[in-house]
Amino acid sequence: MSATLDAPGIRLQVAELLALREGVFQVGRPHPESRRPGAVPAKAAGAGMDLREIRDFAEGDDARRIDPAATARTGTPHVRSFYEDRDDTLLLIADFRLPMLWGTGATLRSVRAARAAVRRGWQAAARGASVAAMSINAAGVAVIPIGSGLQQMSRISHMLARWHDQALDIGGEGPPLAQALLRAGRLAPPGAEVLIVTNAEGFAETEESALAKLARRRHVRVLVPLDPIDAVPPPQPMPIHAGALGKFARLRPVDHTSLAQRLRTLNVHFEAAGDDAG
């Protein structure tokens, strides 16, 4: 590995991700009746066990709540969900494919993406929620199933740093984001929050159906970390090269209006984060 790749802002460090918990992690909160990580009490204890729904089994669900009849009827595991519990689960998806591995400032866009995702993860862990994580790079998709607490955030931080190292070493475009979205649908239970940190070009129109399906019963948000040149491009013409072709052109600030509108039709929220967000 070259010294350049090991420079701060390029090589993602586990220590910096763990340090993001300072000031946000708290202890002491009511425990839900459910043993599934991320379930929080929606009503006071003893308020009853009214059936809310029967849904697909998700990683981390309590196997004791499997509904035998629905499972036998559909051929896939289904669980019962009750009104005394509600899901407080956050799934983080960090995109480390080639378009994220660059930056004109001191930090790669991919590093800021990881920092932004982990910061949201620490905030969720602080309120007692469960957190899961996925990362996509040229090698495929890595997954940390649902869990909670300090150890879970440590596992997520180590996975992201390791997967980012791999992304820097192998480069390449990687699989379509839809591959991660389909797995996310199996990992995140209904009612969960899903944060996808990617670039503005991360979603092809052919992937909209997978994104819409994920957002059908979940709260999905797309976060795009902005590079300095995205928000404040230099005033002078810049050289632009595409293979043997090249020319000078003036750059304009990136406008995400059309992307935000497109995502809104899919019931997905859009957020752009400035260079200082990571």
Predicted stretch roles:
Residues 1-43, 56-61, 70, 79-92, ...:
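Exposed, interaction-prone extracellular/peripheral surfaces
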Residues 46:
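Glycine/proline-rich, flexible active-site/cofactor-binding loop segments
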Residues 50, 70-72, 76:
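Contiguous, often N-terminal, cationic amphipathic patches that form binding interfaces
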Residues 63-65:
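N-terminal juxtadomain amphipathic helix
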